[in-house]
Amino acid sequence: MSHKELWNFVRIKKNTSKLLFIHTPKCGGTYTNNILYDLKIINKNLPVNRKNHIPANGNEKEITFTIIRNPVDRFESLLNFRLGMDIFEDWPQHLHYVYNDKNITLNEIVDKMSDDEILSFTPYKSLIYWTKNVDIIITIEQLEELLNFFDYFYDHNIYKKENVSIKSRGVFNNEVKNRISKLYHYDVLLYDKIKNSTFFHNCT
């Protein structure tokens, strides 16, 4: 069964073509939100608080969808993003000093984090958490195809990526990549499963 056949199955099962976006953090959501806003597609975050991330509960009448990305790239993006902001409450207390020393690399920072600290960022959480009860899971590369399938059309050339993290501390080396992959093992399995196809699990 092709991914379009799966999408059509969801549409028939829920008897609607209305979409509801579930914003998984650090997966291109800001860029996507700009497109969806212009298309008047509902976002689970809006209109209560555009910055909040609200998971699906499985009772939505609309077709819920979310976007995920490579879990290692996602975590690297999170850290680079955080290091460009003020210190968040969930940032490890013993690593506050790295904000004052730009020479400390991303790999050195991760090396000093415990596994629990790596897994405790919020509202970041795991891809498994954010995709629970979601009807359709895609990658950012599949966004335009999905929207077109449900009769939403836009010119992707007028939209630019936003909140792109500046990699001033470098990128992950292979050792750190392997560690993050193991810690987010199930996220990696999920991402690999839908990378070249679409996976849904709420309308079965």
Label the model's feature ranges.
Residues M1-T204:
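Membrane-interface amphipathic segments in extracytoplasmic regions
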